[in-house]
Amino acid sequence: MSGNKRGSRASCPHRGAECLLPWAALNLQGFQLLLLHPSATAMMDVSELGESARYLRQGYQEMTKVHTIPWDGKKRVWVPDEQDAYVEAEVKSEATGGRVTVETKDQKVLMVREAELQPMNPPRFDLLEDMAMMTHLNEASVLHNLRQRYARWMIYTYSGLFCVTINPYKWLPVYTASVVAAYKGKRRSDSPPHIYAVADNAYNDMLRNRDNQSMLITGESGAGKTVNTKRVIQYFAIVAALGDGPGKKAQFLATKTGGTLEDQIIEANPAMEAFGNAKTLRNDNSSRFGKFIRIHFGPSGKLASADIDSYLLEKSRVIFQLPGERSYHVYYQILSGRKPELQDMLLLSMNPYDYHFCSQGVITVDNMNDGEELIATDHAMDILGFSVDEKCACYKIVGALLHFGNMKFKQKQREEQAEADGTESADKAAYLMGVSSGDLLKGLLHPRVRVGNEYVTKGQSVEQVVFAVGALAKATYDRLFRWLVSRINQTLDTKLPRQFFIGVLDIAGFEIFEFNSFEQLCINFTNEKLQQFFNQHMFVLEQEEYKREGIDWVFIDFGLDLQPCIDLIEKPLGILSILEEECMFPKASDASFRAKLYDNHAGKSPNFQQPRPDKKRKYQAHFEVVHYAGVVPYSIVGWLEKNKDPLNETVVPIFQKSQNRLLATLYENYAGSCSTEPPKSGVKEKRKKAASFQTVSQLHKENLNKLMTNLRATQPHFVRCIVPNENKTPGVMDAFLVLHQLRCNGVLEGIRICRQGFPNRLLYTDFRQRYRILNPSAIPDDTFMDSRKATEKLLGSLDLDHTQYQFGHTKVFFKAGLLGVLEELRDQRLAKVLTLLQARSRGRLMRLEYQRLLGGRDALFTIQWNIRAFNAVKNWSWMKLFFKMKPLLRSAQAEEELAALRAELRGLRGALAAAEAKRQELEETHVSITQEKNDLALQLQAEQDNLADAEERCHLLIKSKVQLEGKVKELSERLEDEEEVNADLAARRRKLEDECTELKKDIDDLELTLAKAEKEKQATENKVKNLTEEMAALDESVARLTKEKKALQEAHQQALGDLQAEEDRVSALTKAKLRLEQQVEDLECSLEQEKKLRMDTERAKRKLEGDLKLTQESVADAAQDKQQLEEKLKKKDSELSQLSLRVEDEQLLGAQMQKKIKELQARAEELEEELEAERAARARVEKQRAEAARELEELSERLEEAGGASAGQREGCRKREAELGRLRRELEEAALRHEATVAALRRKQAEGAAELGEQVDSLQRVRQKLEKEKSELRMEVDDLAANVETLTRAKASAEKLCRTYEDQLSEAKIKVEELQRQLADASTQRGRLQTESGELSRLLEEKECLISQLSRGKALAAQSLEELRRQLEEESKAKSALAHAVQALRHDCDLLREQHEEEAEAQAELQRLLSKANAEVAQWRSKYEADAIQRTEELEEAKKKLALRLQEAEEGVEAANAKCSSLEKAKLRLQTESEDVTLELERATSAAAALDKKQRHLERALEERRRQEEEMQRELEAAQRESRGLGTELFRLRHGHEEALEALETLKRENKNLQEEISDLTDQVSLSGKSIQELEKTKKALEGEKSEIQAALEEAEGALELEETKTLRIQLELSQVKAEVDRKLAEKDEECANLRRNHQRAVESLQASLDAETRARNEALRLKKKMEGDLNDLELQLGHATRQATEAQAATRLMQAQLKEEQAGRDEEQRLAAELHEQAQALERRASLLAAELEELRAALEQGERSRRLAEQELLEATERLNLLHSQNTGLLNQKKKLEADLAQLSGEVEEAAQERREAEEKAKKAITDAAMMAEELKKEQDTSAHLERMKKTLEQTVRELQARLEEAEQAALRGGKKQVQKLEAKVRELEAELDAEQKKHAEALKGVRKHERRVKELAYQAEEDRKNLARMQDLVDKLQSKVKSYKRQFEEAEQQANTNLAKYRKAQHELDDAEERADMAETQANKLRARTRDALGPKHKE
């Protein structure tokens, strides 16, 4: 007995869900267990593990040896090492200069920086099972601990809250049944680290917390995730398996196979691994798909069911493998030959190299026996309940794919068409697939393609056929794998009650290969999201909960945010988004995809890099992504095709009709672009989008988002798998590789937060309930105490370290390990209580046993006394006599009585026999009569019951028949409406598809053009920037030269004033005249050089334009014509007049061409009418031909029935049939020719229009260039004329001065002495005048800058005010539209308004706070409202499948009824769990209080945000008022400075022109907005029609479906409205912020300008008169040039328009007209032939008149149907007209956008030309400045020489030298003339510089306006494109709904027929029953 007790004690721990139950709820068995087990084991006994012990925990001796190693804590450190990462070392000397001398274990002495040292842990911390217990936590210590444990094959180690496992690359005996039993129910701290411990912890948390759990097993590829996943599933299957009893019966009924549920869960892995695992370079058994396995448990924790979700199978591996890799295991298992019957069935050999699809890499795997694996796979499928047919079908598809890969094709000679190179493989594949080999090859080689409304057979090249074969193979294998998973789920779904689940995630690990493609990006993106989830859960949410609960905690940023990389991949304009966008464009390629990637991310995202050049790479990399696990180079080859995943839509219908039922099932739901039939009903798995729109990346993102949602709704448990080395060598650890994985996985950070934080927490109520037993006296029962106070009091009464826990608002938090201490104390307390209880119970039992023994003793005493008394008297003599006499006393009397009794007995026996015989006879009669009565009564009752039931059923059937007839009638009417709508929508869809294709092409062209314009604009901006910088440098040099020159001018003026009387001025002026003439000649030479430079520039520009136009059609002729025109227009102005004459002639010719064009258009319309008539005639002929064919068939049948006809009649029939065949062929040829003719006409018309457009563009460019050259030439002529006039005036004044100077020569001698004095004064005045001149020039420049700033400030202010006003109007419109939308919703308006305000005011500052609140709500709901979450998930799934469920209306009703019954069951189950709900309500109440508090905090924050917005609005209004005030002040200042601002009139006029252009653009934008509003109205109308259709369908589905659909639709509309509100509010906020910033900048600029204007006011007044003359001259010149330019532009524009109209259309229209005429004649000839043939047919028809009479009835019916079709066609035509109007409107908007784009291009080109001109002028000014510099130096030298000569002249004058004085005077006059000329030159140069400055500013402003216009055009194009996409989606949805309605109608019709048949049968049966009843009752009534 004691032995049994000990054994049972060891197997019943006191930890688990049972400990939570109160004592009163314990059953009898649990009570007896508590009595027998007084204590639980505190530590696992290693002996329980058997031979597995040494792989999990070292023995005592080994640990003692390790822990007692001598150690010096101050000197032992870790130092970095190049080989082992870190090595152990000893410090030899202290730090000197930041370096320390250390000695390693191998006697090496190193000098290491002190910062690189890491302290070692004492030896007693070696081989730690939990690395969070280390004293020194660093990389080296963690690596050392893992390395030591791995060397002893201990692969599992705890790292804080999660577990780290290292792949051993060998089998270890740590997964046996004894190990599973040893870990069952153990605490984590009691057992060695193991994956079983983590699984058991999750299982116990599920039972204890009543919450769903998940286990995330992550790591790189080859880290051992799959093996650990299998072990976890094995553990759950064994621990939570169903026991014996009723549950066993339920399990047997659920599984329906020989295998139990736990066996099936375990065997699901081998089946999926065979089809989904393969060998890679890093892993021999790599999972090439992801799976999330949910294991469901019942309320008691027993196994209930399971299901599997799979993610992203690597389909490309089916047809391609890298060297060193292998395809999926199932191929090689089948080819292993272990089951020879498979080879025979699949027609396969045993050599994998015979099959291309599976032999591109290796074919074997070390340590893997493919034959044994095949047996395991087959056994697993048997356990999972696969039938033999299902297995054979599965194997056949795999074998067919092998044959599929061996199909070979070759190119036909002299053709691009491919043909089959042998059909053996195709025949085998078709045989296994159950299809026709000929149809399969025909579908591959000649697929049918849909062109408009018809199908055309298309030829394929060899490459296209090979690609189609590969795509079909990949799609078939992928669908086979998904079917396998769904089939396994079907088996594992046992329908047992389930309450919780544990999800196990096994996803493909992070991969970095030499060749990384689209699959690697998806896999690595998934791992990136999972790592971010780990970081968020471990670090961010953990610390946020501390803050939320009020824990004293400082937030630690661990720097592990992976969101930038995730945003790079999945956000809008991310990698996947760009990939999806490219997949929508038909002309997209890998190159365009790569270009978009670099345009959007190169240099903008730190995680996106260009690939580094590496010669070792075998494959090209196009970009690199910085992932958390490393930098991965990706190759984008084939990404577009992989993402679109197209299929040959001719072969798919062949598969759908396959004899192989499994293959037909796989493609049952496929609906491509060529499919016309709706998908079959009754299938649960539906596609959410059409096949052409559902890309692989979209599907992967949706599945990944679902997975992340499921994970967030669970409590996660993390297991980190580590790859020890790249070579898969057991026992070898690459330190750097392991360190890299530890850093990426956040292992150190997880240990750190586990040590510093509070990883364990409990609600106060839970803690009080569980641990009150530790000190019951602390919480008395007779008084009420709050749970928190009770917890504080209880913990305070215990002997614990009070720093190890903290109290939050709702929970108590514990440091790591403290909860384990409390559990041990609780176990001890429970052991003590149970010991006392056992003692009392055993005493009671022993006392009862003692009382029983006492009663037995008394009974024994009584028996013993009686026996002793008998023994005492038995030998007494009298007693012996008594014994002998007593039997003899009555013997005689007894004999007499016995004889009498015997006689009486004989008499009675005779009477009894007679009575018995009579009684038996009567009883038999009675029984027979009674039986007959009962039989008749029962028969009567049965007949009456049958009659009543039959009548009742008859009534019910009649009622149901009436109802169904009404329903059918209603559905028939609705079907007719739907068919009409469907036909209309189909026509509209086809029309829109064509229009959309054209619009897409136009949009592509626009995008290319806009991109080119953007590049040109950027180049122009760069040029303008460079020119601005050069202008600034020139300004500085000119200012410096001006100052120096002015100083020289002052000196020379003084000198000239002193030498006025010199006679030599005449000769000096003559020399000056000659010099000026020479300068004129120099200027003419420079002008010629500038012309040459300009011609070179023009030639370069023409070359660039030619390069740009090479990509367009017919550009060579246009370029040649343009070049010829440019050469002609460059010669002289006289040629312009000749060109004008030619233009007039061309105008006349253009008018004539216009007339001809109109005539040709009229002729084209006539031809179109003739074509329509021809079509009608063709239709009539076709109809007559069909009738004739039908009549001929009837005649032939009758003739055969009559018994044979004559040879002549048969010959006539054959002739008629031949004639009919010929007629049919000719009709088809005529139709094809007609269509080709129409297409050619349209194509030629489009080409002509395009050529005309190109000619117009070229002529416009020529006109612009001519205008520019003309204006330049006129300016040059004016300049030359001005120079000539100046020279003439100078010559006249020089002659006059000669006479004057001759008179004054006598006075010169007297003034020589005075000149000497004045020369000294001049030197002093020169400095003063020089400073004044510099100051004046500076003031002048400041004035000009202020003027330009004021003008720009005004423009900016006006623009900002206008933009603000427009945005306010748009915002008010948007608000009114939103209010209308909110009123239309059937939802609570107040709730929607609150959501609107919350979403509107939750800006960037509160976004993080709101996300935290959402996370809190999700966490609370996931913990305490599991059932509600489950129902929410079901509603979400129902919401997503709503559109697809419309195809299964009746099935949906049944599903809804089933759902109602399940809800009723759930309601009953919830009622039984009222106690748990009460507890959860208490928790929820506390949680709600916390959430209310958080909500109040959020409301306060939102109120603060709202207040800030109001303040900002008030500031904006104040700024606007200030702006208006500043505008008034600016106007006043300008009024005061009108004379100073006259120079800006030209700028104002140009600004006015620009404003007019802006207003025009604004009007165009408003028109576009109106058109967009009209499109919105159309969209709303379509949405209204859609909602009406949906409402009608929902009424047919029933009340429950109606309510559910309304709820889901409202939720969808709410989410859409919410998203729209978010987007609009974000746009408004951004616009407001931009306006605020622009306004602030404008105000600051105006303020600065105002201050500068105030300072410069006085200086401007002084300079006003001086500037007046210059400004007037500039204004006159500019006005003259502007008028000339305007006139030239008008003339050139008129000329270009006329040339465009005449030159483009003349030849083309004539050619088209001729072709149309010829085609019309040909059609007429064909019509005459057809008419003759029709006459022959009529003759033949007259012979068959009798047959036609029999078909007249059918013809009448056909006529009625034709009338019906005619009415439908009328409706279609009306709808077509409406759609054409809509499309015309869209086309108009696109044309407007294109026109605006062209205008922007012209402006950009004009800006480029102006910039080039500015560059030339600047170069000229630079040359002039250089010349002036040289002249300056020459003049300085001359001045010095003049001074020397003047001194000599003075001496000579003193001596009386007259000749010397004359020479000096001549020299002075010469210098004076040169100075005047230089002054004029400088003035002209200064004017030119100022003009260029103004021109540069104008160009900059114009470039900015062009950029804004381009941005607006791009926005308009994007909006139009989005509209087109939305309309296309709407039409597709409408078409799908129409197909659904048609299917419903057919189903309802079928049900009606069935009901009618059942009603007829029931009525017949009822009549029979009535007759039988009357027949049975009739005789009885007569009796």
Swiss-Prot record:
Misc: Expression does not vary in normal patients compared to patients with acute monocytic leukemia.
Species lineage: Eukaryota, Metazoa, Chordata, Craniata, Vertebrata
Organism expressing this protein natively: Homo sapiens (Human)
Biased composition (Basic and acidic residues): 1972-1983
PANTHER family xrefs: MYOSIN HEAVY CHAIN, NON-MUSCLE, MYOSIN-7B
Region (Actin-binding) residue spans: 704-726, 806-820
Assigned GO CC terms: cardiac myofibril; cytoplasm; membrane; myosin filament; myosin II complex
Tissues expressing this chain: Expressed in heart, skeletal muscle, testis, and all specific brain regions examined. Slightly lower expression was detected in ovary and kidney, and intermediate expression was detected in lung, pancreas, spleen and liver.
Record's keyword terms, sorted: Actin-binding, ATP-binding, Coiled coil, Membrane, Motor protein, Muscle protein, Myosin, Nucleotide-binding, Thick filament
Gene Ontology MF terms: actin filament binding; ATP binding; microfilament motor activity
The protein, known as: Myosin-7B
Domain Myosin motor, residue spans: 126-827
Highest taxon, organism lineage: Eukaryota
